[in-house]
From Swiss-Prot:
Annotated localization: Cytoplasm
Top-rank taxon: Bacteria
Family to which this protein belongs: Belongs to the HisA/HisF family.
Keywords: Amino-acid biosynthesis, Cytoplasm, Histidine biosynthesis, Isomerase
Upper classification of the organism: Bacteria, Pseudomonadati, Pseudomonadota, Alphaproteobacteria, Hyphomicrobiales
Entry's EC annotation: 5.3.1.16
A Pfam family per the record: His_biosynth
Active site: D8 (proton acceptor), D129 (proton donor)
Protein name: 1-(5-phosphoribosyl)-5-[(5-phosphoribosylamino)methylideneamino] imidazole-4-carboxamide isomerase
Length: 249
């Protein structure tokens, strides 16, 4: 069980969006490398990064900022946003990423995801971003008719390292994770699921370590961390204690 701090990149800066709207961006740190190092110093063991401009452009836009992050932290980094080809994946893994997140291309070309898992085993995750129960693509700008579980099941047995499931209706507004939908997805597939969107407070962390939620690989936190609604040391201690209890059972 992992708590992933999030760095969302827009125009080279760390921002948070409200409900996925690029016009509602709050800048939290103009220096992504410094933010990555700060999260490492707080005790986090992973980092979740999204190239927001890239998600809309269909190609990497904030490459220099991601490189700065990779240089600043020793922690493994997963990146989503604008990664659409096998060459993109190979390039980013060569530059030091641990895991790439494929979102739009997972809807448009599932076969590419399956091929990527074969070529880069253990390094490919799928991002499922949903609005109103349906999968959204192109930086959340377009809705599809595809259901969340329907898409996830396409990748059963393919070797996908994780599914990052984001509830767009809750993202960046601190209303709490959509636990019902997230756990339903986790029950439906054998692929590890990471919860994203809406993590609001220590209540979500306490919910995350309850027995039925321990099937998740973890959860992603953005605004709640930046706004000080989650105490990193307390959150990480809760997770560590839950892991120890699980091992002891």
């Amino acid at each position: 069980m992992i708590l992933f701090p999030a760095i969302d990149l827009k125009d080279g800066q760390c921002v948070r969006l409200k409900l996925g709207d690029m016009n509602q961006a709050t800048v939290y740190n103009p220096d992504p490398g410094a933010q990555a190092k700060a999260f490492e110093d707080q005790g986090f063991e992973w980092l979740h990064v999204v190239d927001l401009n890239g998600a809309f452009a269909g190609e990497t836009v904030n490459g220099a900022a991601v490189d700065a992050i990779l240089k600043a932290t020793k922690n493994p980094v997963q990146l989503g946003g604008g990664i659409r080809t096998l060459d993109h994946i190979e390039n980013w893994l060569a530059r030091g990423l641990t895991r790439v997140i494929l979102g739009t291309v997972a809807v448009r070309d599932p076969a590419l995801v399956i091929e990527a898992c074969k070529r880069f085993p253990g390094h490919v995750a799928v991002g499922i971003d949903a609005k109103g129960g349906k999968v959204a693509v192109e930086g959340w700008a377009e809705a599809s008719e595809l259901g969340i579980i329907e898409l996830a099941k396409k990748f059963e047995g393919a070797g996908v390292a994780a599914i990052i499931y984001t509830d767009i209706d809750r993202d960046g507004i601190l209303t709490g994770i959509n636990w019902a939908s997230t756990l339903e997805l986790a029950d439906a597939v054998s692929i590890p699921v990471i919860a994203s969107g809406g993590l609001a407070s220590m209540d979500d962390i306490r919910r995350m370590v309850e027995p039925d939620a321990r099937k998740l690989e973890g959860a992603i936190s953005g605004r709640a961390l930046y706004d000080g609604r989650i105490d990193p040391q307390e959150a990480l201690a809760l997770i560590k204690a839950a892991k120890a209890k699980e091992i002891a059972q």
